[in-house]
């Protein structure tokens, strides 16, 4: 039984990355920005796994573990900053917070 072709996996990773990039550029809510960054990081992790499985190397899975640990750290720090900004400014809009800075 054969697996998914590499082109299909990389196409899916590229589509996910583009969706995350569009969300990052279009949305102004900090929660949606963090979710878009998570989608982009997962897309890059998927590309590593697909490329690693193509050449039967464990390097892709090792990079996946590193990307997931980086994503977990980014999510925890991002959510902590999100809570602090919401408590201080009562909004999650990035433009409003930057205008309030003075």
From Swiss-Prot:
Family matches, as InterPro entries: NADH_UbQ_OxRdtase_chain4L/K, NUOK/Mnh_C1-like
Annotated EC: 7.1.1.-
UniProt record, GO biological process: ATP synthesis coupled electron transport
Superkingdom field: Bacteria
GO cellular component: NADH dehydrogenase complex; plasma membrane
Primary enzyme class: translocase
Alphabetized UniProt keyword annotations: Cell inner membrane, Cell membrane, Membrane, NAD, Quinone, Translocase, Transmembrane, Transmembrane helix, Transport, Ubiquinone
Reactions that this protein is recorded to catalyse: a quinone + NADH + 5 H(+)(in) = a quinol + NAD(+) + 4 H(+)(out)
Sequence intervals crossing the membrane: 6-26, 30-50, 65-85
Membrane topology, record value: Multi-pass membrane protein
Cellular compartments annotated: Cell inner membrane
A molecular function (GO) term: NADH:ubiquinone reductase (non-electrogenic) activity
Primary residence: membrane
Function: NDH-1 shuttles electrons from NADH, via FMN and iron-sulfur (Fe-S) centers, to quinones in the respiratory chain. The immediate electron acceptor for the enzyme in this species is believed to be ubiquinone. Couples the redox reaction to proton translocation (for every two electrons transferred, four hydrogen ions are translocated across the cytoplasmic membrane), and thus conserves the redox energy in a proton gradient.
Entries under PANTHER family matching the protein: NADH-UBIQUINONE OXIDOREDUCTASE CHAIN 4L (PTHR11434:SF16), NADH-UBIQUINONE OXIDOREDUCTASE SUBUNIT ND4L (PTHR11434)
Assembly and binders: NDH-1 is composed of 13 different subunits. Subunits NuoA, H, J, K, L, M, N constitute the membrane sector of the complex.
UniProt similarity note: Belongs to the complex I subunit 4L family.
HAMAP family listed in its UniProt record: NDH1_NuoK
Protein name: NADH-quinone oxidoreductase subunit K
């Amino acid at each position: 039984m054969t697996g998914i072709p590499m082109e299909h996996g990389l196409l899916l990773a590229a589509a996910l990355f583009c969706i995350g990039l569009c969300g990052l550029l279009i949305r102004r809510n900090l929660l949606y920005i963090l979710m878009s960054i998570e989608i982009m990081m997962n897309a890059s992790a998927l590309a590593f796994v697909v490329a690693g499985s193509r050449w039967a190397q464990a390097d892709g899975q090792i990079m996946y573990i590193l990307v997931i640990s980086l994503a977990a750290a980014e999510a925890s720090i991002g959510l902590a900053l999100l809570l602090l900004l919401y408590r201080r400014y009562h909004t999650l809009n990035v433009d409003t917070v930057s205008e309030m800075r003075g």
